[in-house]
């Protein structure tokens, strides 16, 4: 939370990450954010609406009260009414300026770099885990823990990739429902009862899970390819079927149902074993990189 001292001495607490929102605030944010992403809502409008919800500030009621009071003063004391009108104008400008600054400081959902919108995909856990039974979890605290399976992750990655193939709202909703079905162990028909905020928010959270592995100093090699464009041997880029086959040939069983972290570790071990074997046979690092699709830097780290 970000603490801001107000003029009256009270402290305003503004969230700086997704996990600091209440359930109601989270759903409201996930309702509006797709419109921001689609360019149908200004980022500042999102920030202002969330600020008003978080603070409970209701500007319309205050303006109405002041207009009524000023009308009463015009009837009883015109001179004071004129002074009050100017005071209200200055107060309104001050309040508006403060609202703008506070709203623009809300960055739990995204950051703005000029006109570029950078979404925040970081969640300490699935924000909807308490709303949906049998939800996939991915907890990031002192250590990372998950109940997600290799199959759930792989299918989820494929579905996220499909989102880019069609821009129509109907297609996006279809893919988001399929993704939620995978991650919440639901049938496709059962996802019809999930709010749009949960569907979109689930995709945002899962994108953060994928991002975690892509940016990880070790697991990241499973997603990287060399400039030659070939797939990394034993890596995630091969596709689920080939990865399962490779791991099962190496002695692993029921790979699709493996815990996601165990699945990732198994792939890393398989790659390291293959690289070590090639190096022992005298194959140069550059040749290993060319064959496997790994970068030379990744190969050198494993030799």
Name each model feature, range by range:
Residues 289:
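The alpha-helix within a helix-turn-helix
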